[in-house]
């Protein structure tokens, strides 16, 4: 049986299996057949702004209908919005057609349960078993019905605003927002301006091809430039599907997911709101975050890389706050998934209440230099096959000394080997990362 699900759904090149119309048709049928076992089922489908979204939306819709499942179409919508709307529309599942921060040549799909949570491994296994079967449509009298929702944007915008302390206001704040020409393009400005901020919005004119193109959470150079030139108070960057957040302080410096989680954690602890005094991060979380949380007596729990695994650890530990340096931040007391807009609102609430600036708020956490090198591969590989790797890694670790870390892993979403080296000395960390990455070239 093929294993189609990665750490964040399915993702790949459009037109290359499994990212084809034929496969998405069968995938819709397979997921629908699993859902239909439990009750009369309905799903909602959202997508980001890449041109291939229309193709895969139609294929999934046909697959679900052929399994007897009703389908509600949302149109372009951030991933976290679909998680929220799955619950409010009382759907059996939510579906997002997106390749997140990747460029337009890629696409993929993510699923949410009726509770707005990523599907469990058990659920994914059921779907993959169904995919191995022959696709057989239900009878004509049992085919599902399709419809399009008229006002999903308004519901989500009001929900986002409700997560911000309404005794506070963003009045007087000058904010630059980069929508990555993605799914937040028609939502972000409304949320932040209706809370009082002066908004300068950039990269909010998607054409199907420019999603994540030199913009958004994975490429903040232009945003940093605009923040400085306009003398804005801060910048906010989302990725293509709106589940990541990176911020820029008033000095044009990047503030990543680890720093943002720390800012929220410190504030919530001081307010007695940090449930179980616990934060969940990943193996990639900066050592500076570990130390800063420890100094506040906040427990840090380490999960595997991927927001799905962060969520699992949060649920097991009873934590309400977790995230990744890449910008996936989960505020479980506010929503059920990583949400760029809602996470930004939590940081802004801290900023407004403290009458501080983003540059000052991040000073309490001293980041260690972290060098990440992504090495492209033709296919998924097994690290155990690289006999030289263990010897080289041991030598690098000895050179780095204490207060350092080496992490080498196969990406769960792309054909990449990720080599991360972290140490107090940036030059030594860079040399170590290059030595290790050269093994795979």
Swiss-Prot record:
The active site is at residue 100. Binds 1 Mg(2+) ion per subunit. It catalyses: alpha-D-glucosamine 1-phosphate = D-glucosamine 6-phosphate. The keyword Transcription does not apply. Its cofactor is Mg(2+). GO terms for biological process: carbohydrate metabolic process; peptidoglycan biosynthetic process; UDP-N-acetylglucosamine biosynthetic process. Its EC number is 5.4.2.10. Activated by phosphorylation. Mg(2+) binds at residues 100, 239, 241, 243. GO terms for cellular component: cytosol. One of its GO terms (molecular function) is magnesium ion binding. This is Phosphoglucosamine mutase. It comes from Ruthia magnifica subsp. Calyptogena magnifica.
